[in-house]
Amino acid sequence: MELDINGARIFFTLPIDLPVLGQLKISETMIVSWIVMILITGLCIWLTHDLKEKNISKRQAVAELLVEQANKFVIGNMGEKFRYMIPFVAALFATSVVSNLISLVGLRSPTSDLSTEAAWAVVVFIMITAQKIKTSGFGGYLKGFTQPIPVMTPFNILSELATPVSMACRHFGNILSGVVINGLIYGALAVASSALLGLIPGLVGDVLSQIPVLDVGVPAILSVYFDWFSGIMQAFIFCMLTVMYIANAAEEG
């Protein structure tokens, strides 16, 4: 049994040569990411259409529940002064969940490409740094690298840079491991199905051995964890780390 896992396909390259970055390539990750954003935007428009103060619909009740949970999550972990973070955290969670689960319809998950999580982590890192500078001032931020003693400066710098790296790799590693495990399971079940059905004598056995019967049903059960549970859990963990890092940055001052 061979397992071949390739990266995102490059569909076409734009005739644009950007400084440092080089040619602009349109990959499968970019296209699916746009599909994810369109789906989320469409869902938000549908949920918030024709809102009422009384006799609300089930659709509006769901929308209000989602907003209420987002408010509780951010304010409960960061405090009232970070209310402005609610739209960002909600958008980050929704994008991560839909990106993780979109593989269920046959599309390649954008989160199985490290560049996706890396981009999210860089944005979060910039917000963390901005909060530290806002709290302590630029001089205080730089001085923090020399604490508790100046000799610790290189280690503090590495620790600071490790934050976005660890956030990106944690999310990416868990999603990629699910892809690899699912691929191994599909391959193993196909081999087992061929071996078992091949025991049937005659033409019937020859025909049935070419059909991966065991691939039907069993992977669907396993996807409840690897796709649904793990996908939602990783999105929650990434958002939790985001709010905790930013909240801690405000307290350091």
Name each model-derived stretch.
Residues M1-G253:
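Selective transmembrane helix interface/packing segments
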